[in-house]
């Protein structure tokens, strides 16, 4: 794959190149010249042609956030990158370059047409995010394994595929294999696939296809199950009670507790642990279920608040629109009367009256906005009190339940200590009938050693409980603070935007009157 431009000096995709390309593609008539003078914003560009420019590396395209079509063919690009922000891209041409690996396309979720024709690609992969892909051109590359075709089965919208010029295209079963494994394909190597060919291909590869479909169905079920688990986990995280609907917290207490695991082999401890775990898990489930209920209440409170704010803003806007409509009807009538009036004193008087009407409208609109600000401030403050109270109550009750977990741990610790001391006494007297594992027996050298071991286990358990409680409290407090802060900031921004809109409209109306020339009126 020699490139005529390989001998030329590589070019950098800098602002100068991009501005030149945008300018060349823009309209050339008077409108185009005006656009060039004023400057074209990259974010407004929908199509960009950068072919035959000896580009080695894709760069500086982050400002083209609304780009739909990008042409980068016939360059010397070796690596796909720099396309992360082009999420609206629909059409991408990277043909006739030096690309060896498909990569850097994970954010192009809207891409429908991709050309990688005439590169150095040997494997088809890393296209999973391109769920809308309809056209894929990979001809004249180095793909030599037919199993690459199986990878393309995941693209349900794929209808056009080009693979001619690859080693696999020389295989005797090339066309039949592709037609069998990609039954929804319409065009292969720029030729339409007829129904007869599809039927022959399906019959020839039926056994392999059936086996593959079975594996795909199993994989799909697993993916759906995993997706459902993740969605459920996110729901639990939103309620701040993830992993409390079972023995996770209890198990985590013993995961790093080597002494506690040794002590579990003491006579009578197994039954003690089982009873302890059952009671502990019940409390965790109580926290979990309570958390979900409280999350639903918080959601209802937030939804109700949002609805109230929306209704208040809508009603206020409708009042403003009515006042503006009444003003404009009167204003247009006044302007018409001014143009028909021939007496200068009367004209001056009428203009002053119009100006007074503009001032009155300004006062009315600002009064409406002030009323809305006061109304929303009261609503926001009430919501803030409610949500803070709800969060406070939730924390209080969770802490109470966590205290019950600590009580269970303290009780278990006391019982375990009793059994340990009793076992030590039996060992000293030689009355212990049961055999103990060597690592456990090593703890019973003296009373201090066994007391320290039981105490260390107890400390680990309490730390795990404390950490889970602290995590829950910290996260829900942070959530509450961020939510309230955002609501206040959003209201400030809304108010500023509305005041700006009112001022701009009033300034326009007043400027229209100020620029009214008597000579034009008299004419």
From Swiss-Prot:
Gene Ontology cellular component list: cytoplasm; cytoskeleton; sperm flagellum
Annotated ranges, domain LRRCT: 166-206
LRR-type repeats, residues: 44-65, 66-87, 88-109, 110-131, 132-153
KW Metal-binding (keyword) present: no
Subcellular location: Cytoplasm, Cytoskeleton, Cilium axoneme; Cell projection, Cilium; Cytoplasm, Cytoskeleton, Flagellum axoneme; Cell projection, Cilium, Flagellum
InterPro entries referenced in this protein's UniProt entry, alphabetically: Cilia_flagella_integrity, Leu-rich_rpt, LRR_dom_sf
Coiled coil: 358-391
Pfam families according to UniProt: LRR_9
Keyword vocabulary terms for this entry: Cell projection, Cilium, Coiled coil, Cytoplasm, Cytoskeleton, Flagellum, Leucine-rich repeat, Repeat
Protein family per UniProt: Belongs to the DRC3 family.
Function as written in the Swiss-Prot or TrEMBL entry: Component of the nexin-dynein regulatory complex (N-DRC) a key regulator of ciliary/flagellar motility which maintains the alignment and integrity of the distal axoneme and regulates microtubule sliding in motile axonemes.
PANTHER family: DYNEIN REGULATORY COMPLEX SUBUNIT 3, PROTEIN PHOSPHATASE 1 REGULATORY SUBUNIT SDS22-RELATED
Subunit structure, as described in the record: Component of the nexin-dynein regulatory complex (N-DRC). Interacts with DRC1. Interacts with TCTE1/DRC5. Interacts with DRC7.
Protein's recorded name: Dynein regulatory complex subunit 3
Organism: Macaca fascicularis
